[in-house]
């Protein structure tokens, strides 16, 4: 059933990702397409963010991106609602000796006003659909301006309401997956490690509309528009030549219409005036 109260849905999401935290890196760290997605997001950010800046990361997970940015010389305050993910992140940060560059805090992105470390920051960053786990994205977005330096950035990686690859799965008889984004205004059920919670889809226009008073758009890119989504497992390994061709096409067309709007995700960046 969809439509759980926001705080209840948040508790379900926390439980799901805490369950997944101990196996998260084993599940995803070796996946070729996930590696491609991470590189695309990081390259996008590095185009705009000045070296040595400070980052507030939302839904930071086990800290893969926080570690990357630490190695690039950025300071990151990594937040998450999942106790399990925060524990994995702390262990990883200690292992790599970057405690001086990565701090962490257990905090919901719907309650950023409660942050102990309020910055201000040069970038607020949310990767890989973390923000799709709330039906209160408007509340999250409204808190951004006060946490940023003048000229600070927001970069979000979000699932839109339409994905070309996903819709094409109808031809494989996967009707539930093919149409799951079409009737999702009240949320669609997601299932992670034995726990169900509601997932919501947002187009770039939703974010632009709610931030337009204080932010300018820097860019929107489609992600896994031509390259298959990572849940089509093993594609890159089974079809290396096709994968290489598709990545080349996507890299060329990522910021063009309609490709920037029909991927599994989109990357959107905005700058505070």
Feature map (PLM): residue ranges:
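A short glycine-rich, Lys/Arg-flanked "PGG" loop and its adjoining helix->strand segment in the class I
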Residues: 138-153
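Acceptor-substrate binding/catalytic loop of class I
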Residues: 190-206
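A short SAM/SAH-binding and catalytic strip from SAM-dependent methyltransferases
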Residues: 123-136
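Conserved class I S-adenosyl-L-methionine
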Residues: 1-50, 64, 68, 153-184
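Class I SAM-dependent methyltransferase SAM/SAH-binding core
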Residues: 62-112
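A short acidic, Gly/Pro-enriched loop at the edge of an enzyme's catalytic core
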Residues: 114-124
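A C-terminal cap/extension of S-adenosyl-L-methionine-dependent methyltransferases
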Residues: 209, 218-273
């Amino acid at each position: 059933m969809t439509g759980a109260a926001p705080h209840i849905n948040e508790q379900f999401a926390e439980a799901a990702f805490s369950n997944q935290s101990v196996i998260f890196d084993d599940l995803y760290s070796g996946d070729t397409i996930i590696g491609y997605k991470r590189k695309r997001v990081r390259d996008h950010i590095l185009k705009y963010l000045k070296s040595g800046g400070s980052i507030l990361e939302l839904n930071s997970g086990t800290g893969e991106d926080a570690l990357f940015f630490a190695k690039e010389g950025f300071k990151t305050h990594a937040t998450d609602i999942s106790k399990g993910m925060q524990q994995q992140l702390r262990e990883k940060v200690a292992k790599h000796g970057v405690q001086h560059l990565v701090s962490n805090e257990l905090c919901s992105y719907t309650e950023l006003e409660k942050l102990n470390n309020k910055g201000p920051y040069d970038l607020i960053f949310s990767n890989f659909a973390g923000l799709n786990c709330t039906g209160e994205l408007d509340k999250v977005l409204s808190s951004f301006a006060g946490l940023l330096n003048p000229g600070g950035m927001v970069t979000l990686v979000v699932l839109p309401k339409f994905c070309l690859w996903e819709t094409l799965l109808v031809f494989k008889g996967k009707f539930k997956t093919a149409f799951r984004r079409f009737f999702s205004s009240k949320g669609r059920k997601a299932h992670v490690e034995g726990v169900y919670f509601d997932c919501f889809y947002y187009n770039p226009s939703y974010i632009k509309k709610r931030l337009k008073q204080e932010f300018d758009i820097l860019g929107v890119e489609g992600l896994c528009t031509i390259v298959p989504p990572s849940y089509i497992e093993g594609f890159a390994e089974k079809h290396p030549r096709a994968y290489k061709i598709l990545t080349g096409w996507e890299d060329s067309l990522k910021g063009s219409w309609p490709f920037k709007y029909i991927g599994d995700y989109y990357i959107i960046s905005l700058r505070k005036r």
